[in-house]
């Protein structure tokens, strides 16, 4: 049995990552998942969070993904996400301003705005956390 599997991370705009990895940690609405090579086939939703994986060379990598879908089939995993960014591509000032806007909308908004603001707040916090890790 192989100890690696193929990971593809895809957004509507571009492919973010395409390569073999040893393991990945990601989050769905239930909690944190660890996926290793030869995992059973499955499909799950993902939430905005920091994804951690170890590439085939043993290097640990982290990136932010927004909500999406993760599919595992025949030792290949594809994550389809609205957006995904490695730390190098995150603008910390922009993320902090997005956080401030979301917090303000939470205080002012109606129920619909509140739900959107909560999601925007989660995205901005996860981006900030990732940027500050590196």
From Swiss-Prot:
Pfam annotation, one family: ATP-synt_DE_N
Keyword vocabulary terms for this entry: ATP synthesis, Cell membrane, CF(1), Hydrogen ion transport, Ion transport, Membrane, Transport
SUPFAM superfamilies with a match to the protein in the record: Epsilon subunit of F1F0-ATP synthase C-terminal domain (SSF46604), Epsilon subunit of F1F0-ATP synthase N-terminal domain (SSF51344)
InterPro entries in alphabetical order: ATP_F1_dsu/esu_C_sf, ATP_synth_F1_dsu/esu, ATP_synth_F1_dsu/esu_N, ATP_synth_F1_esu_C, ATPsynth_dsu/esu_N
GO cellular component: plasma membrane; proton-transporting ATP synthase complex
One example GO MF annotation: ATP binding
Subcellular location, principal: membrane
Membrane topology note: Peripheral membrane protein
Domain of life: Bacteria
Keyword Phosphoprotein: no
Stretch forming the signal peptide: none
Compartments where located: Cell membrane
Task performed by this protein: Produces ATP from ADP in the presence of a proton gradient across the membrane.
Alphabetical list of HAMAP family matching this protein: ATP_synth_epsil_bac
Family, as annotated: Belongs to the ATPase epsilon chain family.
Record text on subunit structure and interactions: F-type ATPases have 2 components, CF(1) - the catalytic core - and CF(0) - the membrane proton channel. CF(1) has five subunits: alpha(3), beta(3), gamma(1), delta(1), epsilon(1). CF(0) has three main subunits: a, b and c.
Annotated protein name in UniProt: ATP synthase epsilon chain
Organism: Clostridium botulinum (strain Eklund 17B / Type B)
Lineage: Bacteria, Bacillati, Bacillota, Clostridia, Eubacteriales
Gene field: atpC
């Amino acid at each position: 049995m192989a100890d690696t599997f193929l990971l593809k991370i895809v957004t509507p705009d571009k492919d973010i990552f395409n390569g073999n990895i040893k393991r990945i940690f990601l989050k769905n609405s239930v909690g944190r998942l660890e996926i290793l090579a030869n995992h059973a086939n499955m499909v799950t939703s993902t939430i905005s969070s920091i994804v951690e994986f170890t590439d085939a060379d043993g290097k640990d990598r982290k990136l932010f993904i927004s909500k999406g879908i993760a599919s595992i089939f025949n030792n290949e995993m594809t994550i389809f996400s609205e957006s995904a960014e490695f730390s190098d591509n995150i603008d910390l000032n922009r993320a902090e301003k997005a956080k401030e806007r979301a917090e303000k909308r939470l205080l002012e908004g109606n129920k619909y705005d509140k739900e959107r603001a909560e999601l925007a707040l989660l995205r901005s916090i996860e981006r900030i956390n990732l940027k500050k890790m590196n």
